Every structure is written in C-alpha cells, then in structure tokens.
Design a protein with these regions (language model features):
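Charge-patterned, long linear interaction tracts outside catalytic cores
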Residues: 152-192
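Gly/Ser/Thr-rich loops at beta-strand to alpha-helix junctions
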Residues: 17-20, 78-87, 106-109, 155-158
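Two-metal-ion RNase H-like nuclease active-site motif
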Residues: 1-26
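Charge-biased, low-complexity intrinsically disordered regions
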Residues: 1, 48-50, 59-63, 114-115, ...
C-alpha cells in the first residue's frame, strides 16, 4: 500500500485501559475501552466507554461505538480486552463489511488461552468459539523491528501486511492502535 493510499484511509484503533483485580464478590469491575478514528496519521475522533472485566460486553460496545463513524478498517490490539472480555472480529466484520485486523506484539498462544478459559469460565465454549473462527496467525516484519503477529477477517494477508507497514509511523505498532493505547492508558492513570 502506497503511503498516499494510507493517508486516504480511515482506520479505527481499539485498545483498553488497565485495571486492578478486586477481591472475589466485589461489584463487577470496569475498564476503559477506547476507539480512535484516524484519517491517515491524523486523529479525526475518539470515543471512550467502559467494559466489564472478564465480561462479554466488548463486542456489543464496539459495534455501538463504530456505528457513529464511516471507516475502511478496524485494528484491534488483540481480541482480549479487560481480562477475557473478547471482541468477536467475525461479528464486527459481518456488521460493517469492513476488514478487522487483530494485532499482537507477541505470538498468541492459543493452547494457553484455551486452558485458561477452561479453568476460569463456565461459558468457555462461547469465548473459545471466537478464537476458533479466526484465521491463521501471520508474522509481519517492520524494518529493524521485532515482528508483529496478525490475524485478519475480511481481507487477505497481503493487503493486511501493506496496511500494517504503512500505518506504523513511528514504531512497529500501527498508529491507530498506538494512539488508542496512549489515550486508554493515560485516562486510566488519571482516574486512579
């Protein structure tokens, strides 16, 4: 993807803020959930909401937030937010018909994920189904950087590689995710 093409795209980055684990029996804990709309490298808009730690409301919240924008693609910083509150990339793609790119800094270990889901969640099959619907994990290398690991729904890996490389403006992390992370972590620190 030529840099000029990247400058014309509107891409959403999604990231969560941190949280502290509360003792068992405490009220449902929340974490910030941030979506940023970038037009090229320019921040066009952002939204902040809350999702439940280890809940199942992240997909619904994301779909609701995305209905406010016109965009070309969504980049998720993984599929797990606020612990194991999972965004279903297939559901997001089906709702909007736009590619959903899942970006991970480290290679996902789906065996460990499945084991954790089995141990901690009665509804593990629902959560695991989200992982099963994802495509293969691909490695994307940025010059002089450690590789990223990506999965994509709704587009091919060649397009995805070009999008990742074009949107990695100042480091290996694509700018939509990097900006969403800065906002989410900054607001989380401010709230504590």
């Amino acid at each position: 993807m030529h840099l000029n093409a990247w400058q014309e795209l509107r891409v959403v980055g999604v990231e969560d803020g941190g949280f502290f684990r509360e003792p068992s029996g405490s009220a449902a804990q929340k974490a910030l959930f941030v979506c940023v709309l970038l037009h090229g490298n320019w921040i066009e808009d952002f939204q902040v909401d809350e999702i439940t730690v280890d809940g199942l409301d992240a997909s619904k919240k994301l779909v609701s937030m995305l209905h406010h924008w016109a965009f070309h693609a969504v980049m998720l910083a993984g599929v797990s937010f606020a612990g194991f509150n999972l965004v279903d990339p297939t559901l997001v793609f089906e709702e909007f018909g736009k590619p959903v790119v899942i970006v991970s800094r480290t290679k996902p270990d789906n065996v460990a994920v499945k084991n954790a889901l089995l141990r901690h969640f009665e509804d593990w099959q629902i959560r695991w189904g989200i992982f099963e619907r994802l495509g293969p994990i691909h490695e994307v290398s940025i010059i002089n950087e450690v590789p990223l690991y990506v999965e994509v729904v709704g587009e091919d890996i060649e397009w995805t590689n070009e999008l990742i490389r074009a949107s990695a403006a100042c480091c290996r992390i694509p700018e939509p995710i990097r900006v969403a992370r800065l906002i989410a972590r900054g607001l989380t620190r401010k709230a504590r």
